[in-house]
Amino acid sequence: MAQLFFRYGSMNSGKTIEILKVAHNYEEQNKTVAIFTSGIDDRDQVGFISSRIGLKREATPIFSDTNIFEIVVNIKPKPNCVLLDESQFLEKEHVFQLAKIVDELNIPVIAYGLKNDFRNELFEGSKYLLLYADKLEEMKTICWFCAKKATMVLRVDDKGKPVYTGEQIMIGGNDHYYPVCRKCHANPPIK
């Protein structure tokens, strides 16, 4: 029986590389996957997932008006698995569509994303995935500064100073965000 998985972790926890690995494993067995990513994440190129170690793959971009269920139901042959990157950027309705894919099409869905933002508040997509996922799995990495387990994301400005207010979504990578533990989020050892 198919399930909805939410695999969440801080920055640099290997979420995208895990998607690429899972896709490879399915395809190695002559099974098909449908890969989606946020249409607002344009760090590399819209419609692609790209890992920090340089691996890249095409993916269907999700925008506010995208109906993920309708896209998946029309894929022939029916995919054996649906994979999503940057799922923190999903909207509530998108999460309901993912649950519908699992419940009505019996296709497993694995969503990967951040749980919380730089203010340590939940993203909309993460909130509803936490509520509706059948299985929650934490992907771990270490704090940028002290090597404890990273559970938060620290945003820094162009001068490298910590930022705790502002718009929730600002697309960026290691130049503006760091995986950190709770202690280093509150008092980052930045000069």
Swiss-Prot record:
PROSITE patterns: TK_CELLULAR_TYPE. GO terms for cellular component: cytosol. Zn(2+) binds at C143, C146, C181, C184. Pfam families: TK. Coiled coil: none annotated. GO terms for molecular function: ATP binding; thymidine kinase activity; zinc ion binding. It comes from Listeria monocytogenes serovar 1/2a (strain ATCC BAA-679 / EGD-e). SUPFAM superfamilies: Glucocorticoid receptor-like (DNA-binding domain), P-loop containing nucleoside triphosphate hydrolases. Gene3D superfamilies: 3.30.60.20, P-loop containing nucleotide triphosphate hydrolases (3.40.50.300). The keyword Kinase applies. The active site is at E86. This is Thymidine kinase. It catalyses: thymidine + ATP = dTMP + ADP + H(+). Homotetramer. InterPro entries: P-loop_NTPase, Thymidine_kinase, Thymidine_kinase_CS. ATP binds at G9, S10, M11, N12, S13, G14, K15, T16, D85, E86, S87, Q88. Keywords: ATP-binding, Cytoplasm, DNA synthesis, Kinase, Metal-binding, Nucleotide-binding, Transferase, Zinc. Belongs to the thymidine kinase family. It comes from the Bacteria. It is found in: Cytoplasm. The keyword Transferase applies. GO terms for biological process: DNA biosynthetic process; thymidine metabolic process. Its EC number is 2.7.1.21.
